[in-house]
Regions:
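Non-catalytic surface loops within mature trypsin-like serine protease
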Residues: 26, 124, 234, 271-273, ...
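ABC transporter nucleotide-binding domains
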Residues: 2-4, 9-205, 210-211
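Conserved protein kinase catalytic domain
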Residues: 73, 117, 172, 219, ...
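Hydrophobic/anchoring residues in structured secondary elements
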Residues: 9, 251-254, 297
Length: 332
């Protein structure tokens, strides 16, 4: 449904995105994830025809975004980060206006508007001026204008930003209800939304795609992150020294302990990839006479994956930059 191949956008000599490649299959919800400034919005604007690419191709429903821009726009619904709403129109009036400019036939407009209103749970607000709506309801109107012409592909840029927890849940459920009959790209930097909403995730950092997989697949690929949180009695240094010598232990982090537990120490043990040293950890502590109050298994989260991929990429890029700027031997 959506195919992006080696897409690049350069401003002057500065690349906003470079060789971005990914696919979204029909009916999928794909999270487009990255830190602020990673290139998410630039990619979304190219896909929706708002911005031309410097090089590369993007196709939606078989149509090239550059060569068949109008055909693409007829087949997508777009919710930018700031919804394009007219505050002095009613919800229903605004959606009729959008349906008309998006080419919905006159005889079908009322039905499409009613469908979008029902789908977005706006029945009680249909005759209310948009300026009187809460941010959560405005976001629903923004999604309604994106789907009123029933497009096969929907592109949502930060759809839950600025919403309160209840509004986030409502918008999340709405997006999930659109899956199957629509193909959705969800651009965000809010990690919980991705794991709760999306079938697959594409992570972009510094303008480049660094990973594409299911949320579960990404967590399984993490080089480290799973492990154990342990609370022990007595000398933490002794416990740490014991843990360092256990095969399969990759890293140890010190943790704060709960209030009123002055004699206890908290430790997080990060396991090496493919290792499960839990039994060895417990045996070593008990054999050494270290009091073991609690030992809890932990697993890598999408946040761990995100931090590893984006931080590693930044470190590698910075290191390369320093190397390239380093004077050659013999230079003064």
């Amino acid at each position: 449904m959506i195919e992006v191949e080696q897409l690049s956008k350069i401003y002057g000599s500065t690349p906003a995105i470079a060789d971005v490649t990914f696919k979204v299959e029909p009916g999928e919800i794909v999270g487009f994830l990255g830190p602020n400034g990673a290139g998410k919005t630039t990619t979304m604007r190219i896909l929706t025809g708002y911005l031309p690419a410097t090089s590369g191709t993007a196709r939606i429903a078989g149509y090239d975004v550059h060569e068949n821009s109008m055909a693409v726009r007829q087949r997508i619904g777009y919710l930018p980060e700031t919804p394009p709403l007219y505050p002095d129109m009613t919800v229903e009036g605004f959606l009729h206006f959008v349906a008309r400019i998006k080419g919905v036939a006159a005889g079908d407009r009322a039905g499409q508007v009613n469908w979008a209103i029902k789908r977005c749970n706006l029945l009680e607000k249909r005759r209310v001026l948009i300026r009187k709506l809460s941010k959560g309801f405005r976001q629903r109107v923004g999604i309604a204008q994106a789907i009123v012409h029933d497009p096969p592909a929907i592109i949502l840029d930060e759809p839950t930003v600025g919403l309160d927890p209840r509004q986030i849940i409502e918008v999340r459920n709405l997006i999930k209800s659109l899956a199957g009959s629509h193909t959705i790209i969800l651009s965000t930097h809010i990690l919980p939304e991705v794991s709760m909403t999306c079938n697959r995730v594409t992570i972009i950092n510094r303008g480049k795609v660094v990973a594409t997989n299911t949320p579960e697949g990404l967590m399984a690929q993490l080089t480290e992150g799973s492990g154990y949180e342990i609370e022990v009695d007595g000398d933490r240094d002794t416990a740490v020294e014991l843990l360092r010598n256990i095969p399969g232990v990759s890293r140890i982090e010190l943790l704060p302990v709960s209030y009123g537990a002055e004699n206890r120490a908290g430790v997080r043990v990060i396991s090496a990839t493919g290792s499960e040293p839990g039994r060895e950890i417990a045996a070593a502590l008990v054999s050494a006479g270290v009091g073991l109050y609690e030992m809890r298994r932990t697993t890598a989260s999408l946040e761990d994956v995100f931090l590893e991929l984006t931080t590693t990429e930044k470190v590698e890029t910075d290191a390369s930059s320093e190397a390239s700027n380093k004077p050659e031997s013999g230079e003064g």
